[in-house]
Amino acid sequence: MTKIYHFIGIKGSGMSALALMLHQMGHKVQGSDVDKYYFTQRGLEQAGIKILPFDAKNIQADYEIIAGNAFRPDNNVEIAYANEHGISYKRYHEFLGSFMRDFVSFGVAGAHGKTSTTGILSHVLSNITDTSYLIGDGTGRGSAGAKYFVFESDEYERHFMPYHPEYSIITNIDFDHPDYFTSLEDVFNAFNDYAKQITKGLFIYGEDEQLRRITSEAPIYYYGFEKGNDFVAHDLLRSTTGSTFKVSYRGQELGEFHIPTFGRHNIMNATAVIGLLYVSGFDLNLVREHLKTFAGVKRRFTEKVVNGTVIIDDFAHHPTEIIATLDAARQKYPSKEIVAIFQPHTFTRTIALLDEFADALNQADAVYLAQIYGSAREVDHGDVKVEDLAEKIVKRVQVVSVDNVSPLLDHDNAVYVFMGAGDIQTYEYSFERLLSNLTSNVQ
């Protein structure tokens, strides 16, 4: 009898990707979640994967049950039922830790850039050889015959500790998730523990002073722009069609590469992938060829045009990510005004990084702020308001509501960059509807 996988919280980005991967590998998959639409569910619907409302009746003793990390007996009827009846289940990261043992696995960790880098590595490697992968934008691909497995390795609550990949990239270390991590040193300790679990090769951004402290039994390869790294990206040419650059390895030239994405951070992401695939024995000519066709990942600098107005949707919700996204927008649209529409995500992060958010948003030409999107894990004690952030921004700034985004029309020759990890897309859709009243020409 074929095993049935049931996902509690199937619309989560990691969960939906895993569900898609298992489905493509020939397994029977279903899941449950809230009614609210999430961008991840489109892929599930296209695959014909059943999405059910939460209900204790969904839980059967003979199912392989995978539970999202946010769900507990006190907030989910399915978890409560499973606990009451002695029905076992695994958390996402627990399942993944055992699943990857059947593959040569490539992890991508880091405070920022995980999803984009996982996307680049998955795209290139799956075009070279049969590869299964999980990307944090909700994309998953499974193949029963795959030898290689690429996955995103999340540090939140140390979820990456069950993972023991052969190879891993670590893009950076930064203080984030202040609801869990107590300090930058706490974040470092988590990554350092993870690094000790890598068995064959660790690829680290060498210009991050925290990452330079990392130790591992596996060989460590540093990548970056500066000469002190093993893999060095140099002779950069950033244009409106993407980024071209050369890479050298310990003084040996590996050639020129092009990636049709924007921002210095994506050059680094690509360099990490080049280094990993070079060390693990893949043909760099094939790597070079497939980098050229990378089309990006969901909610990372995703563009559309409405009546000649460029709208960019991005998941950026940390100051470092905001800076990178605005840098990418200026690279592609150097002659346009860059208008940022940002929704802070979680009260704890907003309080902890209020000054840093203001500094990052000042990189835009004008800023619009949405109300803070609180996490289900926290309570709003009134300690911070979005107006507190607005007061610290020196550029033109205004707080807008989802019901009235008309102030955004006060710009000519502008690119609108919507950023956030909450429901910022509702503001984006509201703006698109406003523009559609002016025209029906949507590309």
UniProtKB/Swiss-Prot annotation:
EC numbers on record: 6.3.2.8
GO MF annotations, alphabetized: ATP binding; UDP-N-acetylmuramate-L-alanine ligase activity
GO CC annotation: cytoplasm
Cited Gene3D superfamilies: Mur ligase, C-terminal domain, Mur-like, catalytic domain, NAD(P)-binding Rossmann-like Domain
InterPro entries referenced in this protein's UniProt entry, alphabetically: Mur-like_cat_sf (IPR036565), Mur_ligase_C (IPR004101), Mur_ligase_C_dom_sf (IPR036615), Mur_ligase_cen (IPR013221), Mur_ligase_N (IPR000713), MurCDEF_pg_biosynth (IPR050061), UDP-N-AcMur_Ala_ligase_MurC (IPR005758)
Subcellular location: Cytoplasm
Protein name as catalogued: UDP-N-acetylmuramate--L-alanine ligase
Species for this entry: Streptococcus gordonii (strain Challis / ATCC 35105 / BCRC 15272 / CH1 / DL1 / V288)
